[in-house]
Regions:
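Gram-negative bacterial Sec-dependent N-terminal signal peptides
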Residues: 2-25
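Sequence/structural signature of beta-propeller domains
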Residues: 27-542
Length: 542
């Protein structure tokens, strides 16, 4: 389900100054480096009409490696690695661009490109086929904000592939990518993170799950790329207070194996490249300046891509540098990774094959249905209870908690049938066969953190509605009612509810007919655990 996360970060200057008391900062405050070594490009491509970003797309046949350029209104341009232009594909106003390998389309692994279309502020998808991009998107995926860049991230846990779009207003939108039965690629939002000002670039590390974002006025951030993880950022380097002089620029990741995994970032104001050690918490390693083959300085490097694969004349791969201000017109420079690391007395290591798709750590089970997103931001969709219709399974119902707003009742297509804004409901459970007013009913209870109470409902399976049947507020007497479950004794037929406090204390109540069409609780016993119990499941044995 979609998770909407908003970091309440107040402003660029206040943000950096607050790091000691908030998000972690990976670097000490130091003056910018001086006297950085100069590294010349190994190749300058021929000038293109516009060069927003470029990626090298690898092929099994090295002669068919391609450089794909996001060329603004010219769409996507295709060049060989000598810089010769081979073709062009319409893609709207192409800006940001990224590539991943082994994406399944109709059961076949394909090389997938994602690009931003700045005309519509949307994402478009292409498969690399016979050396050229072929559009395979089910649609142009709208973002709803002014997009600046896009990067992709493969989740190592389940193998899911995500596109991460960043925007002019500080938006970070993470979308899960999938192909339908017809082979069309689509996306759905997984989470949104907001920073208070423009994010210009992003890059992601599939191996570690780290997402890096360049907030232009502030610096380089590192996030956990798992959409279910805490979105708390760590500041790798800061503009003004760190090594970045004024504005943070583009980002790239190089993987040379153990001891040679680097984050590369540009200082948009000075034109320097900064290199950080991803194996040591992104510790700073050194800085360099770049020139073209002719020695002309690359004053403001644009988008970057690092390719850790042997290329012709470049045994450790290349850093693709966008040079929008080249004298002869915008082009791309290929900088030898070996030359760059050598200038900084670093090891290039052993280039890792970016085309190798590592098997996910856990098996993947694909859902056959998904509910509409809950209305509250953050980790709000927490706990479901399912009523299974024994006669017509398609009419079964799902009750889910919105931990910040109440309960939702869904049908089996995921549509919201009812929303009850009754408080912060943490967990929910149900039992059939409770006798209320002489009739068996489906009884539903939830741990209500707003009123510190047991919330009690009857599920009307015909009307498909939840009806509050609590005999007034049923207080728990707990400081923070948290994990909850129900139990029906097979021996006595009595129905119970258990709720634990966040301090580990658990309390049990019997649910009884109050005689007025309502239900009340009668406290049965207390017992304690040494720490907080998030959720308890009970199996009826007597």
């Amino acid at each position: 389900m979609t998770r909407r996360l908003t970091n309440k970060l107040l402003g660029a200057s206040a943000l950096v100054l607050a790091m000691a008391g908030g998000a972690a900062w990976a670097q000490d405050v130091v003056a910018p480096a001086v006297g950085a070594p100069v590294v010349a490009a190994a190749l300058d491509t021929r000038s293109t009409g516009e060069a927003s970003s470029g990626v090298i797309v690898l092929d099994a046949d090295a002669r068919r490696h391609r450089l794909v350029s996001a060329a603004g209104l010219a769409g996507l341009e295709v060049l060989d690695l000598t810089g010769a232009r081979l073709g062009q594909v319409p893609a709207g106003e192409a800006g940001g661009l990224d590539v991943r390998y082994g994406f399944p389309i109709k059961g076949r692994p394909e090389t997938l490109l994602v690009s931003t279309d700045k005309t519509d502020n949307a994402l478009r998808f292409f498969a690399m086929r016979d050396g050229a991009p072929v559009e395979v998107g089910a649609r142009s995926v709208p973002l709803g904000f002014a997009v600046e860049d896009v990067c992709m991230l493969r989740n190592a846990s389940d193998g899911g592939l995500y596109a991460v779009a960043v925007g002019d207003g500080g938006e970070i939108e993470q979308l899960l990518l999938y192909a339908d039965a017809e082979g069309r690629v689509d996306a759905r939002s997984a989470r949104r993170i907001n920073l208070p000002s423009k994010i210009k670039y992003c890059v992601a590390d599939d191996a570690t799950g780290q997402l890096y974002a360049s907030q232009q006025a502030v610096g380089v951030w590192r996030f956990n790329g798992d959409p279910e993880a805490d979105a708390a950022p760590a500041l790798v380097d800061a503009a003004g207070l760190g090594r970045i002089s004024e504005e943070s620029g583009s980002l790239a990741l190089y993987d040379g194996g153990q001891g040679a995994r680097y984050l590369i970032a540009t200082d948009a104001s000075s034109g320097r490249l900064f290199v950080y050690d991803r194996g040591a918490g992104d510790a700073y390693l050194g800085a360099a300046s770049l020139t073209g083959r002719d020695g002309a300085a690359i004053k403001e490097p644009g988008a970057l891509q690092a390719v850790g694969a042997p290329l012709a004349g470049l045994p450790s791969g290349a850093l693709v540098v966008t040079d929008e201000d080249a004298a002869a017109g915008p082009d791309y420079k290929l900088v030898s990774i070996a030359a760059l690391t050598g200038a900084l007395n670093l090891s290039a290591g052993t280039p890792q094959d970016v085309r190798a798709v590592v098997a996910p750590r856990f098996p993947t089970v694909v859902a056959v249905a998904e509910t509409a997103p809950v209305g509250s931001p953050g980790d709000a969709a927490d706990d479901p209870a399912i009523w299974a219709d024994p006669t017509h399974p398609a009419n079964s119902l799902v009750i889910g908690t919105d931990k910040k707003a109440g309960l939702n009742l869904y049908d089996m297509q995921g549509r919201v049938l009812q929303h009850l804004p009754d408080g912060k409901m943490n967990n929910v459970d149900l039992r059939e066969g409770f006798i209320l007013g002489g009739q068996p009913v489906v009884l539903v209870t939830a741990s209500d953190r707003t009123n510190k109470a047991v919330a009690i409902y009857r599920l009307d399976t015909e009307a498909r509605r939840l009806i509050n049947v609590a005999d007034g507020v049923q207080p728990t007497g707990q400081g923070d009612p948290y994990g909850q479950c129900m139990y029906r004794s097979a021996r006595s037929g009595k129905t119970y509810v258990f709720i634990n406090d966040s301090n580990g204390e658990k309390r049990q109540w019997e649910l009884v007919d109050a005689g007025n069409g309502k239900v009340r609780v009668v406290r049965v016993r207390d017992f304690a655990f040494s720490s907080q119990v998030v959720r308890t499941l009970l199996r009826a044995r007597g």
